[in-house]
Amino acid sequence: MKAIFVSALLVVALVASTSAHHQELCTKGDDALVTELECIRLRISPETNAAFDNAVQQLNCLNRACAYRKMCATNNLEQAMSVYFTNEQIKEIHDAATACDPEAHHEHDH
């Protein structure tokens, strides 16, 4: 039972941290968003890239920036992303976004 509780706390922490950074991407200008999404594309797995391409198509967009903007517009980015991505894929995108964000504080780059 204790393990389940700890697992649940980890999921909540992951969702909170992922959502916070993804919300930052929602406020980026178009050029910055396109640049970061291209960087993310190069860092995520083929499966996650395929899921992103699927989201673009299902959202009737021509590119990932459009799809991301539409997910941001729902006012619940985490929930919108969960329609197209698994929790693991969302974490992968978050990790790549953090690495690609020129404004992020990269604590591991000492």
UniProtKB/Swiss-Prot annotation:
Keyword Disulfide bond: yes
One GO cellular component term noted in the UniProt record for this chain: extracellular region
Superkingdom classification of source: Eukaryota
Keywords assigned by UniProt, alphabetized: Antibiotic, Antimicrobial, Copper, Disulfide bond, Fungicide, Immunity, Innate immunity, Metal-binding, Secreted, Signal
Entry's Gene Ontology molecular function annotations: copper chaperone activity; iron ion binding; metal chelating activity
Paired cysteines (S-S): 26-72, 39-100, 61-66
Location within or outside the cell: Secreted
One of the protein's GO biological processes: innate immune response
Signal peptide span: 1-20
Tissue: Expressed in the hemocytes, fat body and ovaries.
Keyword Metal-binding: yes
Cited function: Has bacteriostatic activity against the Gram-positive bacterium M.luteus, but not against Gram-negative bacterium E.coli SBS363. Has fungistatic activity against C.neoformans, but not C.albicans. Binds and sequesters copper and iron ions. Copper-chelating is crucial for antimicrobial activity against M.luteus.
Record-given protein name: Antimicrobial peptide microplusin
Protein species of origin: Rhipicephalus microplus (Cattle tick)
Lineage of the organism: Eukaryota, Metazoa, Ecdysozoa, Arthropoda, Chelicerata
